Every structure is written in C-alpha cells, then in structure tokens.
C-alpha cells in the first residue's frame, strides 16, 4: 500500500470524527483558535518523535522540558520551593498517582493498622478517582452534594477520620462546574494529618485568570497535591497533565524503583515506563510561546463566552443553569418551575442542537446515597474558539429549545418495557455474548453502527437500568467497537 494511499485512508477516517477545531464540539476538545500554536506543537512533537521519555538521563531534553513545565505550573498554581511535580500522560494518570502517593504515605504512618484506607470526596469528583480506589484498594466514600452541585464543607469534614488516606476536592467539578470549599476542607484535613488533593484537571490553567474565585490552589494551607491538565486549557495535544506535590519526601512515594532483576535499574516517576516525549515537548513549546499573558488572554475569551452563554440559557424559558458555575463550563437542566408545556428536557435539547451542527454532552441524573437525586443535565465546555461562533451557537441553542419545548423526557418505564422480556430477571453475571445480544436487542449494536443520532433514549436507558448492568453493557459496547472485524 502506498504512503499516499495510507494517508488518504487516514484522512477519510478522520472525516468521520467529530470536528476538533472550529468550536462546534463543546466537550472533549480544547481549541485555542490559534493556528500558529497548533503548528508549533506539531513541530515540537516531530522533533522528539524518536525520543523515549523513560530515561531523562539518556534523553536529557526530557528532563529539561519537564523541569521547565513543572516550574511554570508551580508558579502559576501557587506553589513554593517545597512543591515538586511530574508531567503525566493525562488527568487520569495524575489522579491515580495522587491517590497512590497518599495511600502509601498513609500506610507508612500506620495510623490505622490493618484497616482499609478510605478515599473521601464529593460524589461529583471525577470518575478517575473511582478508578484509583478500585486499582489501589481504597474504600470509596462519596459524599452527596446539594441540588446545585455544591458540597457542604461540613459534610466532608464530619466524615474525616484516621482511616482517610486522602480527601479530594475539585476546582471545579466537571459535571456542574462547582468550586468545592477547598480552604475549609484542606484546613480540616491538615488538622487531622490527612492529605488533601485538588483536582484542577479542567480548571487549573484557566482559574488563575478567572474573576472572583475563592482560594483554591497550592497557596491554600493544607493542600498537599494538585493536578492540572496541559491537554485541556493548556491547549497541548493529548496526553499531557501536571501533578504537583507538596514536599519532596511525600512525592517520592509516587515513584516506583527496583534493582531486583538482571536488567537495567528501573526508576519510574509515573505509571508508564517507555513513553512518547511528544506531548511533553508540545506542552513545553506552548507554555513558552503563550506565557502567563497568553494564557490570561485566552482565559478572558473563555470568560466572556461563558458569561454570554449563562445569560442566554437563563433567558430561555424552560431551561436553567445548574448552580453557580466557576470556570469555562456549565450544566443545563430542565426548569421544573414553569408549566409542563413550557419545559425543555436538556437531553432532547442536546439532540436537537446536534442535528443543527453543534455537539453538547449529555449527562444522566444520579440518585445519591441520601435519597436525593441530581437531575439529568447537558454539559457545555467553552473554549477560546467559542467566541468566534457565539452568535451562531446562540441562535442554534434558542431554536433547538423552541423545537423541543413541551416534549416530555424519555420515560424510564417505556425504556424498560422495550427490553427483551425477562431480561432483567435472567441476567446474572453477563458473559460477552449475552451482553452483545442485549445490546443488539435494544438497537445499540449493528453492522457499521456507532451510537444513535438521538442520545436521549440512550441516556434514559442508562438511568433506568441498575448501574452494574449499564457498566457491563457499556464495557461490551466499547470493547466491540475496537475489535477486529470478522
């Protein structure tokens, strides 16, 4: 196969993707709108394409770039000379390493001999921390939040105890853009000798320039670590994130090292051994090109667009913005205070917006442990490029709202009634073929098919079925998507 044919096929495959530039996808994509920054990042990645990030003593450029990126992040995020850090492959790895570090340090203190360490966080904390608890054997203690998405500091503080290895707060939370009460929680954690991590993966490179934000970063007493994604509002290619840790001795627990094999001595600061230096080089180049002033200018654009969109959504009868979002993201829910024929279901709204050329992110509701329920919402992430399409986007949001006004949400009972007879009673532990049969039965898997164009019924199904079942079915759906075709 010729090189040109290969590239042509890749271009054809890419044409089926959601657009990564232009502001038409309001999740997953962090577009600065600066073509020269994209070109700089690509050139930097090309220069280090053969470099193995495993060993910064052999490839010394890796050590220099990582040191300079960490230094910039430390200065931006309120750290002092006692703060050290690493560049990871993404927010999930940063979160995993923060939990692993805290767990190992907790074990070293032996405050609860024989106990299972506990990870304490609001229920809105990123799912990466659920993964971390699962991987590293911590009990996950998720605290319910208010209908606004905000968590009470007291609700977290009263659950602290000697078995808590780490408390996590968000700056802001992804689902609702709520800024957790970081100063109060960190102070209480410090008083009990508990590590406190700030997950600023989505906000870390933007909130330093945002208006009227409560203290949230490493300048807050009691904060022991912080994560901030370079591949979000640091505008770097996937995947690059920074994990900052307070105290060299604390941070060394993040590392893995062994000389107990007949090969080369292994020392890994992060989860991976061999890894591409490309995302690091791109992030390093962008940090130097933009500097604080460049990031501030891009954040200002995000803030203007966010303010405009919050005002617009608030003006649409039947919709409401959830809580008081902090940063360039927001969640939109149905306004139950208006008559039923004036209400707008956020999932039908998102589907209608998609049909008109913009992609929003549907979020299911959640039944919390205290019996309260968080409503279904639609999520929007705002980037600098949003400002250039703001008029078109606003017109689409309004027109889509009118198109679905009064259409009731998908009824969970109707969703369950459409399932094959007796399915829920006979499932037990699903094997792969049974899971596939269920997916086919509900129309989610067919030859060449992706997810449905209308996602509201799909989200209603997720909400209606037991969580372990939906998790198993979604696992099968994603696994089948990347299996070799027969």
Describe the predicted segments one by one:
Residues 1-63, 67-71, 333-486:
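Non-catalytic terminal extensions of PLP-dependent enzymes
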Residues 58-62, 85-92, 121, 323:
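Active-site nucleophile and cofactor-binding loops and adjacent substrate-binding regions
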Residues 73-98:
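Short loop-beta-helix segment that forms the pyridoxal 5′-phosphate
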Residues 81-82, 323-329, 373-375:
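Short Gly/Ser/Thr- and Asp/Glu-enriched loop/turn motifs at secondary-structure junctions
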Residues 87, 320-325, 362-364, 370-371:
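Short beta-strand
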Residues 89-257, 263-269:
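Conserved PLP-enzyme active-site core in the AAT-like
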Residues 184-187, 191, 308, 348, ...:
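Alpha-helical scaffolding segments of alpha/beta enzyme cores, especially the outer helices
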Residues 212, 216-328, 332-342:
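Active-site C-terminal subdomain of aminotransferase-like
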């Amino acid at each position: 196969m010729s090189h040109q044919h290969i590239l042509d096929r890749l271009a054809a495959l890419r044409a089926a993707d959601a657009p990564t530039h232009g502001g038409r996808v309001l999740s997953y994509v962090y577009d600065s709108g600066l073509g020269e920054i994209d070109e700089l990042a690509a050139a930097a990645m090309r220069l280090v394409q053969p470099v193995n990030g495993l060993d910064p003593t052999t490839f010394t450029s890796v050590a220099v770039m990582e040191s300079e990126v960490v230094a910039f992040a430390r200065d931006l995020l309120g750290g002092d000379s006692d703060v050290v850090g690493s560049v990871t492959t993404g927010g999930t790895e940063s979160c995993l390493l923060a939990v692993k570090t805290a767990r190992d340090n907790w074990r070293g203190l032996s405050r609860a001999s024989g106990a299972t360490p506990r990870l304490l966080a609001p229920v809105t904390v990123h799912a990466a921390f659920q993964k971390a608890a699962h991987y590293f054997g911590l009990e996950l203690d998720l605290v319910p939040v208010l209908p606004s998405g905000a968590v009470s500091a007291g609700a977290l503080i009263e659950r602290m105890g000697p078995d808590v290895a780490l408390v996590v707060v968000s700056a802001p939370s992804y689902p609702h853009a709520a800024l957790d009460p970081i100063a109060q929680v960190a102070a209480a954690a410090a008083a009990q000798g508990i590590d406190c991590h700030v997950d600023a993966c989505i906000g870390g490179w933007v909130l330093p320039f945002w208006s009227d934000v409560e203290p949230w970063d490493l300048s807050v007493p009691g904060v022991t670590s912080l994560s901030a994604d370079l591949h979000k509002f640091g505008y770097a290619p996937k995947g690059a994130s920074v994990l900052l840790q307070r105290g060299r001795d604390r941070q060394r627990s993040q590392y893995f090292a062994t000389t107990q094999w007949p090969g080369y001595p292994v020392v890994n600061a992060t989860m991976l051994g061999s890894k591409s230096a490309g995302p690091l080089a791109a992030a390093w180049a962008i940090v130097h090109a933009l500097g604080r002033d460049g990031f501030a200018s891009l954040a200002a654009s995000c803030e203007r667009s966010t303010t405009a969109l919050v005002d617009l959504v608030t003006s649409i009868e039947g919709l409401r913005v959830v809580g008081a979002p902090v940063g360039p993201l927001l969640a939109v829910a149905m306004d139950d205070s208006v008559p039923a024929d004036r209400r707008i279901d956020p999932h039908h709204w998102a589907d209608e917006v998609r049909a008109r050329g913009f992609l929003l992110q549907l979020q299911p509701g959640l039944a919390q442990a205290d019996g309260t329920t968080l409503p279904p919402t639609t999520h929007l992430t705002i980037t600098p490029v949003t400002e250039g399409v703001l008029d078109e986007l606003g017109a689409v949001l309004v027109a889509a709202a009118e198109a679905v006004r009064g259409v009731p949400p998908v009824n969970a009972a109707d969703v369950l009634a459409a399932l094959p007879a007796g399915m829920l009673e006979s499932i037990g532990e699903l094997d792969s073929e049974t899971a596939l049969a269920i997916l086919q039965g509900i129309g989610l898997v067919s030859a060449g098919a992706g997810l449905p164009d209308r996602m509201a019924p799909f989200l209603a199904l997720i909400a209606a079925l037991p969580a372990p079942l939906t998790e198993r079915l979604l696992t099968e759906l994603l696994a089948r998507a990347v299996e070799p075709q027969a």
